[in-house]
Amino acid sequence: MEVKDANSALLSNYEVFQLLTDLKDQRRESGKMKHSAGQQNLNTITYETLKYLSKTPCRHQSPEIVREFLTAMKSHKLTKAEKLQLLNHRPMTAVEIQLMVEETEERFTEEEQIEALLHTVTHILPAEPEVEQMASTEAMEEEGPA
């Protein structure tokens, strides 16, 4: 096998999750569950990939959310790879953003720029329901008794 163009397309975790889910549904509907060695390997890879992706933020995304996110990212002047990492991982702290965006100190001269990027990411991309519940519980604990 030969790779013609390594960067012809970048896929987000959401796109891979949707593609594999659709393929799985199509195979189930058609009743074609081939049992060749190659097909078994493909089924295993599909299962393991879906199992992993179902535990990531992509599970709660939609085409509209991805479109809105990419539109909002235009003002931040990020590379395609950086946007993809932010979309796939949904960072929740400035440190996580600094790990995903190269040369953050030079490109974002003010702390407010990183905070604005973080706000955009956390505002548009849905959080895991468990994470949102933990965050609201921690916020209530910090407020203390009234």
From Swiss-Prot:
Record flagged with keyword Membrane: yes
Any Gene Ontology CC annotation: plasma membrane
UniProt KW keywords: Cell membrane, DNA-directed RNA polymerase, Membrane, Nucleus, Transcription
GO biological process, one term: transcription by RNA polymerase III
Main location class: nucleus
Subcellular location: Nucleus; Cell membrane
Membrane topology: Peripheral membrane protein
InterPro entries associated with the record: HRDC-like_sf (IPR010997), RNA_pol_Rpb4/RPC9_core (IPR006590), Rpb4/RPC9 (IPR005574), Rpb4/RPC9_sf (IPR038324), RPC9 (IPR038846)
Xref: Gene3D superfamilies: 1.20.1250.40
GO molecular function: DNA-directed RNA polymerase activity; nucleotide binding
Keyword Cell membrane (UniProt): yes
Family annotation (Pfam families): RNA_pol_Rpb4
SUPFAM superfamilies: HRDC-like
SUBUNIT field: Component of the RNA polymerase III complex consisting of 17 subunits: a ten-subunit horseshoe-shaped catalytic core composed of POLR3A/RPC1, POLR3B/RPC2, POLR1C/RPAC1, POLR1D/RPAC2, POLR3K/RPC10, POLR2E/RPABC1, POLR2F/RPABC2, POLR2H/RPABC3, POLR2K/RPABC4 and POLR2L/RPABC5; a mobile stalk composed of two subunits POLR3H/RPC8 and CRCP/RPC9, protruding from the core and functioning primarily in transcription initiation; and additional subunits homologous to general transcription factors of the RNA polymerase II machinery, POLR3C/RPC3-POLR3F/RPC6-POLR3G/RPC7 heterotrimer required for transcription initiation and POLR3D/RPC4-POLR3E/RPC5 heterodimer involved in both transcription initiation and termination.
Function: DNA-dependent RNA polymerase catalyzes the transcription of DNA into RNA using the four ribonucleoside triphosphates as substrates. Specific peripheric component of RNA polymerase III (Pol III) which synthesizes small non-coding RNAs including 5S rRNA, snRNAs, tRNAs and miRNAs from at least 500 distinct genomic loci. With POLR3H/RPC8 forms a mobile stalk that protrudes from Pol III core and functions primarily in transcription initiation. Pol III plays a key role in sensing and limiting infection by intracellular bacteria and DNA viruses.
Membership in a protein family: Belongs to the eukaryotic RPC9 RNA polymerase subunit family.
Name this polypeptide is given: DNA-directed RNA polymerase III subunit RPC9
Top-level taxonomy: Eukaryota, Metazoa, Chordata, Craniata, Vertebrata
Primary gene name: CRCP
